[in-house]
């Protein structure tokens, strides 16, 4: 690398540092003074269920005054309490209202009533990466790399704010109208300076240190990135079995097999991300994220252009209009019931 290139690299690293310092300032302001109750259920017209979960659902809604479409996450307070997810739910809202990055879904409104908590986010009509990946089978390496680069930048941003994401998987990555990623579902995200111990995540994506009940840190996100890149490029995850316990055995074994079509650069990157030994895992070494960004598999990636969304996406989802739901599955519809008495007031006071 010539002197000019070295100088350019140096100035890029400096400008990233400046950017992240400013981002942290912005984040902390909102983290310390979270927005509360800036809308109500009556402001929205409910259109269709986009997804369901163990303690709530996500619906397409239309803001009556602005006619904008949004995705509204509705959480049943009593179910959240029953499933011991109070802390996770409060984390999700507090984090989402404070972050700001091109590849993170934006929280526009949050409010609660006697029965439910509501988070209203921008609606991403392209649907989940999961459904496109299953339909196409697998992504070419350049296609996978385009998405992977956005996750690398997003994790660099989140980790600089002391946030661990902990739930990377194709179901939580939405494809927007320009073919870029929007990371959604911050239900397991957490602000942690040192280590944390909670067992959470999706079996196929869990890092070995989580399975082994060790204290863990941000490095679990880099492991999950390895799993995601593998799954995007192969069409199936690196560790899979019928029962979670069998998956866990494979994960902690430290053995990964690669399809013959994987390039040698891809295999090398994955061996360094799917590294059981934390002292050797990329993203967790003294150079931090730059071991990943400067890896040969990313040699063609223009990180600044990706951040600026100037790179042409390999795939643009098809949809008709901003309220189209054809990229989402159908679910049984259910009325939103609101109690006449307030439930769990104490638990969700800060929401």
UniProtKB/Swiss-Prot annotation:
GO cellular component: cAMP-dependent protein kinase complex; centrosome; ciliary base; cytosol; extracellular exosome; nucleoplasm; nucleus; plasma membrane
Domain of life: Eukaryota
InterPro entries: AGC-kinase_C, Kinase-like_dom_sf, Prot_kinase_dom, Protein_kinase_ATP_BS, Ser/Thr_kinase_AS, STKc_PKA
Cofactors, names only: Mg(2+)
Residues that bind ATP: 50-58, 73
Disease cited in the entry: Cardioacrofacial dysplasia 2: An autosomal dominant disease characterized by dysmorphic facial features, congenital cardiac defects, primarily common atrium or atrioventricular septal defect, and limb anomalies, including short limbs, brachydactyly and postaxial polydactyly. CAFD2 patients may show developmental delay of variable severity, intellectual disability, autistic features and focal seizures.
Function: Mediates cAMP-dependent signaling triggered by receptor binding to GPCRs. PKA activation regulates diverse cellular processes such as cell proliferation, the cell cycle, differentiation and regulation of microtubule dynamics, chromatin condensation and decondensation, nuclear envelope disassembly and reassembly, as well as regulation of intracellular transport mechanisms and ion flux. Regulates the abundance of compartmentalized pools of its regulatory subunits through phosphorylation of PJA2 which binds and ubiquitinates these subunits, leading to their subsequent proteolysis.
Official protein name in the record: cAMP-dependent protein kinase catalytic subunit beta
């Amino acid at each position: 690398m010539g002197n000019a290139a070295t100088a350019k690299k140096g100035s890029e690293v400096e400008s990233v540092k400046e950017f992240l310092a400013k981002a942290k300032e912005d984040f902390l302001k909102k983290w310390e003074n979270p927005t509360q109750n800036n809308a109500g259920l009556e402001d929205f017209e409910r259109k269709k269920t986009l997804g369901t979960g163990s303690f709530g659902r996500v619906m397409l809604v239309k803001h009556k005054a602005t006619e904008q479409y949004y995705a509204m996450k509705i959480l049943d307070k009593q179910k959240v309490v029953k499933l011991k997810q109070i802390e996770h739910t409060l984390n999700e809202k507090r984090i989402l209202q404070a972050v700001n990055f091109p590849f993170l879904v934006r929280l526009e409104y949050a409010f609660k009533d006697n029965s439910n908590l509501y988070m209203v986010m921008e609606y991403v009509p392209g649907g989940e990466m999961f459904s496109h990946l299953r339909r196409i089978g697998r992504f070419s390496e350049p296609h996978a790399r385009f998405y992977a680069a956005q996750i690398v930048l997003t994790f660099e941003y989140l980790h600089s704010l002391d946030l661990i994401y902990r739930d990377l998987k194709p179901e939580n990555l939405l494809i927007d109208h320009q073919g870029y990623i929007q990371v959604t579902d911050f239900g397991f995200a957490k602000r942690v300076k040192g280590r944390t111990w909670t067992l959470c995540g999706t079996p196929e994506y869990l890092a070995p240190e989580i399975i082994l009940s060790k204290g863990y840190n941000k490095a679990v996100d880099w492991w999950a990135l390895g799993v995601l890149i593998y799954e995007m490029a192969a069409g199936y995850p690196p560790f899979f079995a019928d029962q979670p316990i069998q998956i866990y055995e494979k994960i902690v074994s430290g053995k990964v097999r690669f399809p013959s079509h994987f390039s040698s650069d891809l295999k090398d990157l994955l061996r360094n991300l799917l590294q059981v030994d934390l002292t050797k895992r990329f993203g967790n070494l003294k150079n931090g994220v730059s071991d990943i960004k400067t890896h040969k598999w990313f040699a063609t990636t223009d990180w600044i252009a990706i951040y600026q969304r100037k790179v042409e996406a390999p795939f643009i989802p098809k949809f008709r209009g901003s309220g189209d739901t054809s990229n989402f599955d159908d679910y049984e519809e259910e009325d939103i019931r609101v109690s006449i008495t307030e439930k769990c007031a104490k638990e969700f006071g800060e929401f």
